[in-house]
C-alpha cells in the first residue's frame, strides 16, 4: 500500500512540476517578447543561414503553442496506456507487462517516464 501511495504522490508531484514548467515557459516567452526584433528568424538552411522569418507575435504564438502541445502530449500519453488495447501499446513483452495483475503498476511507470520526458522537453525548449 505504501509503494502505491508513493508512486501516486510521485506522479502527482511530477505533474505539478510539468505544469510549473509550462507556466515558466509562458513567463519566459512573455519576458523576452519585448526584446525580440520585429522579424524573427524561424528556419535555417544546412549552413545555418536563416531562410524563414516570422513576426515576433507569430514566433511567440508558435513557441507558446508548441510548449503547450508538448505539455498536453506528455500529460496524456501515460494515462492513455490504461485505456488503449494491448495491441496498440509498443512495449517489449507487452502481454507480460499489461497482464491484469501488472497493468496498474506498468501504467504508473509509463506515466512517470512520460512526465520526466515532458519536463525535460519543456526545459530544453526554453533553453534553445
Task: Describe the role of every protein-language-model region.
Residues 18-21, 54-77:
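Alpha-helical transmembrane segments
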Residues 1-8:
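Short, Lys/Arg-rich, polar N-terminal cytosolic tail immediately upstream
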Residues 13-18, 108-123:
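Select subsegments of transmembrane alpha-helices in polytopic membrane proteins
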Residues 9-37:
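Short, basic/aromatic recognition patches
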Residues 85-105:
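Juxtamembrane inter-helical linkers in multi-pass membrane proteins
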Amino acid at each position: 500500500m505504501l509503494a502505491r501511495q508513493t508512486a501516486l504522490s510521485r506522479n502527482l508531484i511530477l505533474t505539478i512540476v510539468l505544469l510549473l514548467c509550462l507556466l515558466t515557459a509562458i513567463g519566459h516567452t512573455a519576458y523576452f517578447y519585448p526584446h525580440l526584433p520585429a522579424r524573427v528568424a524561424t528556419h535555417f538552411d544546412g549552413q545555418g543561414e536563416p531562410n524563414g522569418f516570422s513576426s515576433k507575435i507569430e514566433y511567440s504564438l508558435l513557441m507558446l503553442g508548441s510548449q503547450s502541445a508538448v505539455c498536453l502530449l506528455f500529460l496524456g500519453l501515460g494515462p492513455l496506456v490504461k485505456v488503449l488495447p494491448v495491441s496498440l501499446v509498443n512495449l517489449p513483452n507487452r502481454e507480460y507487462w499489461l497482464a491484469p495483475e501488472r497493468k496498474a503498476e506498468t501504467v504508473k511507470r509509463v506515466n512517470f517516464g512520460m512526465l520526466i520526458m515532458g519536463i525535460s522537453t519543456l526545459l530544453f525548449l526554453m533553453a534553445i
